[in-house]
Amino acid sequence: MTVDVTETISQTVHPAFQLLRQHHVEALDILVSEYKHKVTGAVHYHLATDYDENVFLVAFRTQPMDSKGTAHILEHTALCGSEKFPVRDPFFLMIRRSLNTFMNAFTAADWTAYPFATQNKKDFQNLLSVYLDAAFAANLNPLDFAQEGIRIELENGQPVYKGVVFNEMKGAMSAPSDQLYHQLAHHLFPETTYHYNSGGDPKDIPDLTYEQLVDFYKVHYHPSNAVFMTFGNQTAYELQEQFEKLALHKFSAGTTLYSKPEKRLAAPIEVTENYGVDSDDLKDKTYHVLSWLLPEANDIKLRLGMRLVEGILLENSASPLRHYLETCGYAQSTGPLMGVDDSNFEMTFYCGVQGSNPEHAQSFRDGVLNILRDVAAKPIDSNLVDAILHQIELHQREINGDGTPYGLSLILNGLSGAIHHNDPIQIWDVDSAIAQVKEELKDPMWLSNLIQTHLLDNPHRVQMTLVPDPTKSVKEQEAEKARLAAIGEKLTDADKAEIIAKTKALEERQDTPDNLELLPKVGLEDVPADLHIVQGQLREIICNRMDTPLNLYHAGTNGIYYQQVLIQIPEDIVKSPYFNLLSILMGEVGAGEYGYLELQNLQTAVSGGLGMGASLRSKVDDKDKISAWLTLTTKSLTQKFDAIHLLKLAFEQLRFDEKERIIELLQQRKTRWQSRLSGSGHSYAMQIASRNMSALAQRDYQNTGLGALNWLGELVTKITQDDAAYDELIAELKRIHSKLLQAPKQFLLVCEEHQSERLVEEIQNVWDKLNVDTATTELTQVEQANDNNHEAWLIQANVQFCASAYQAVEVSHPDAAPLMVLAAYLRNGFLHSAIREKGGAYGGGASYDGNACSFRFFSYRDPRLAETFKDFEASVQWLLNTEQQPHQLEEAILGLVASMDKPGSPAGEAITACYALLHARTPAFRRTLRERLLHVTLDDLKRVARQYLVEQTPVKAVVAPFAKRDELQQLGFTIQQVN
């Protein structure tokens, strides 16, 4: 409901602001208030709740009209010092001086945002002062632009490009999915800002000048062009008082930017573009995609209607369009662009496939359009519509917050509406929009007509075929070399002297210690005395005629329950690569009397999905043993008990007779895995380096590493061509399934207290009897790798990911805490500057991993190789041989404790608490570890550095482009490659 703005309410409004309206969103139990700053017109949305994790975000409408990366580089440079805080790196310094639960900055296609979250009020005030000054009074030092954006340096007398964003975007644009998105947008949006890459195209970034950056800041970073959003238990008045005092009072009215509608195509177009691959084998590497430009996103009824259309067409494998794309025969998987994108000014709709060939472009287009015609020709089944509405309600009600803070998730959901001068309250309060849609659904052809109007009859349609090109990467590298050579030929001695002087000035700036007294901070005295751990109840129910533990947690879940079955995994299953394949199948193949298409629709109608996964940890006191639990998961609205029945059915009666479907699922897994490698290169590098340092590390390298991707590709080829190989696979999966049915079980239930007894009773009734094959089974043994070579893996990428690993101790060992602090200390004090600021990598650092029982250094999207490994070792010598400051130790500890204390969603905290108990991470264990962290000393850091790092030889690993093969061989790496 919307609340009238009364005189009583207005008395609580800060005098610099005008209250426009208030609206209570019942489904979320939040009061949304919209305000306008009287002088500048800045908009403020406050989401009032009783949560003590308060969230702040300020966003600007940024609309670049080129691909130089102006908005992205400005996002970085604005955080490099401001009027009140003239230190070189306030953003990363505040991460260390804070108890934040989230700090970041984002550059989207047409907005830039600066969010943070914290549970500590003093910390909130500190971060708010730094963020507001960075946003509205950034210094924009030319040397920071050179560091973060783009610069030329001389190496052996020849010019080279350097810059953090330059290397970041080289890494980002090596991913085929990123190339697909940006090349498609180039055609779908011929004239507006979406035509360009706001993050920056590496070939265009060198064209950006410092003066252009400053001009962009002056136009876009003004309160009149800003949206403020806040969430939590602080009042809007006290927040606005700070906005006014710290920033807004200095401004008069400025320009507000508005988005422009795209010029519409008169007829559909077809285009072919290419992307780089490092192989001459081009078979099955083409992407096909169809995209439509839809109306503006401001019509909430149409927006929700198109979401329903997306659900009808694409929700699951039984949905007609997804089913066609998955079974068409000319592609290996659906593509990365699928469904409605309503985050821009005008909505878009995508569908596509990957793992195809260029000659199938017409078949793809004709097949998609035929499906759309079939669906649009008749009324949509009302049961399917109800199932999609159920998914929308479930998504609306669910309280997330286990990755991104819950309040920030809500804010980001509504931000696009506010940025485009639309109404974000309509997005938060979807119940009222659903009521409008239900009125429209009384016309049985309403959704069918939306398909006809906005897809079939819409001339603004782009079909793109993205084909692999083994020469593209080489051509891009040669073009960059030629450009730099041309620059070098024109350089006079005076030009070279100027470049050298600027390089020296940047190095001096990077080496000059910041005056940390200029920045606010929290200290260890502000850390909560105790670790908050959710407490549950241990019940007993009967499962398969045996007493079975049920872990019950009461939580404010907003009308949703979460049910899991927890199965202790036998050791031979843990190490089997086939186990991961079984988890791909559950919920995706049929079960019992239901084929997979029927089961897909059932899941959509009664649950938030069915899942099978694994929770794996090293034993707390023995690195050679694994604590392993299979997790069967579902969630649903509390009135829908059918999800409990469906979870048991899908696991107990999982079918292995749908051969085409099983091959299809494994093929999809392989194709999607291949397309996502470059975003996780640092994780793979650390996994490779530490692969033999614990039993779990070895298992993960063997079963989830890059070698496992090659193994899966070979397996898919075998079972596609050889019936006997397929039969062997199914026999192995059946053996694993049989063992899991026999294995000991527990249950986990998270729900609201008043619903718990009914749900416990239902779980008892459903799981009372279990069909178990008690025959003993032996699994196929797989040979485990055990060498400690320095290993390099070659993938499709333009930058490197480096890692070094040292054998460390189990997490229960007293040295685990100082090793954790050591990692943060080296990152803060040395590695960030050496690897990111000076080396030009997008990121780098160190970590102690209690599961791999290793201490690991890493870099991310790194232009260097050998120099980075030298920096890893130099960081240890820096610690041991230079004077260290106590404040650096406090900062390292603060960050670790903040991470440990970070809240999750109500359900997420309960699930985390239960899993911790399963793996012997008891409350006493967790509190002891936290207490040890708080008491680590500098002497402890030096001791463990000598013991674990100086006295060992590290195992090194690199994930790198194919072009680095020769250099890596010269450095002594054993070369592997992703096929």
In which residue ranges do the predicted regions lie?
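Non-catalytic, conformational "gating/processing" segments within enzyme and secreted inhibitor domains
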Residues: 214-246, 729-763, 953-954
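In a subset of proteins, long, contiguous C-terminal domains/tails are tracked
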Residues: 934-979
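His/Glu-based metal-binding/catalytic segments typifying zinc-dependent metallopeptidases
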Residues: 47-50, 57-59, 166, 170, ...
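Extended, regular secondary-structure scaffolds
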Residues: 215-217, 227, 236-255, 378, ...
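M16 family metallopeptidases and their MPP-like homologs
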Residues: 53-63, 89-137, 144-152, 178-203, ...
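Non-catalytic terminal extensions that flank enzyme cores
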Residues: 2-55
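Hydrophobic, small-residue-rich alpha-helical packing segments that form membrane-like cores
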Residues: 152-225, 229-247, 251-277, 282-284, ...
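Active-site His/Glu-centered metal-binding helix of metallohydrolases
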Residues: 70, 74-78, 582
